[in-house]
Amino acid sequence: MSISVMANSHLNQPYASASPTPQEKGRTCRYAGQAVRALPIRVITVGKKRSEGVRLLVDEYKIKLKPYCSFEDSLVRSNPRNAQDVRAQVEDEEVAMMKLIGSDDWVVVLDERGRDIDSEQMAELLGDAGNSGASRISFCIGGAYGHGTQVRKRANVTIRLSSMVLNHQIALVVLMEQLYRSWTILKGQNYHH
């Protein structure tokens, strides 16, 4: 996999720049079995009150992640000022999201136009973030109309969980499982086959 550097206003961090080549499919994570600095993880989701089923699944994965890293789940209310204009709604959500992103966070934006990565690459993303000098990794899940310009510009990397558009609650559950899977890959544990 080729590694390139993406310039950010305050961080200059490596990230995988392209989808895996056919030769890279089926490979293992380059950090597997190595010591990786465990950054605290914050997931910032734009949305409304979560369903009971989603809350239960998120809580289950919070417990599973505890041995690996600290975890914080933040919910930004969608359309906080009840804007009638879509652009105003996205801007309002963006302001709230940006308040939760620290100046030295390593930011991953989830977007259907983002880079397609596999589970090993997600584990490598956690390893890259841990080696970056950042104090935390923040994953950002946008609202119904996506992310604003500031959030996109702030991203160290933009990935997608699927080629399909996912409801923010489904995206959160998929992300939680992938974070757990990534840590088991990094630790060489029997979960990912």
Swiss-Prot record:
It is an enzyme of class 2 (transferase). InterPro entries: Alpha/beta_knot_MTases, RlmH-like, tRNA_m1G_MTases_N. S-adenosyl-L-methionine binds at L110, G142, L161, S162, S163, M164, V165, L166. It comes from the Eukaryota. One of its GO terms (biological process) is methylation. PANTHER family: METHYLTRANSFERASE (PTHR33603), RIBOSOMAL RNA LARGE SUBUNIT METHYLTRANSFERASE H (PTHR33603:SF1). Belongs to the RNA methyltransferase RlmH family. This is Putative RNA methyltransferase At5g10620. It comes from Arabidopsis thaliana (Mouse-ear cress).
